Amino acid sequence: MDKRWIGILIVLIAGLGCMYLIVSNSNSVGSAVSVINDVTITLPPGYITSEDTSNMCVLHNKQTNETIRIRCLDDGADYINEYNNRLKSLNGEDDIDIQKNFTNKTLSMIKYENQSSTDKKDITLVFFEKCKHTFSMQFEHFTNETNQEKMMNFIIDTLKYDFKQNTG
């Protein structure tokens, strides 16, 4: 075998190794995606899309009954204003017990308990901006707060601008 063929085999093996590492560490390669306006979202493992419109997507985990509602708000909406408006409306209701609320540089979050409802007892609302859009996420039926934060970070990290939707 010629030295050129050995070099070609080494480059080929290195290329295949790099492709394997890229695919194994990617959140979107080989995963299901959904589109909200012109932004794609990668579905977390174990979740399916139970409702899908142009500006909203509902993700559901059948094993744990956890539900995530992701909504793209109006184009001119500011996530801090949306957060303040929602917090003000929740404070006005008697049967709502707000457990946690905060705002940082990337998102605003309200965690509350609805005393009068048996179906949606613990609800967490998250408002944030990404890809020139304002989004709200609503988490329902989550019993593990660590898992909820993990799903929230996964969704925010995998939101990507979908260039295929805007080809003109």
Task: Locate the predicted segments by residue.
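Signature of long, low-cysteine stretches enriched in small and polar/charged residues
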Residues: 88-135, 142
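Short, Lys/Arg-rich N-terminal segment immediately upstream of the first membrane anchor
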Residues: 1-2
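Surface-exposed amphipathic alpha-helical segments
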Residues: 45-47, 135-168
